[in-house]
Amino acid sequence: MVKNKLKEIRMTKYMMNSNEFCKLIGIKANTYSQLETQKQQGNIETILKISKALNLKVEDIWYLED
């Protein structure tokens, strides 16, 4: 299963609430909520957009859980 570290990144690196973080990365709050809670994996466009906004590699945010 694909997992992400969005909440960890938001809380430790940016110290923002989710609404502020959504504005920073340029996605809708409901989309972000679905991603952060692992209810949705996101499409490739959204994944790349977030990666670019955070200046991180995709694999630094998303990973395969063993």
Predicted stretch roles:
Residues G26-Q41:
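Recognition helix of helix-turn-helix/homeodomain-like DNA-binding domains
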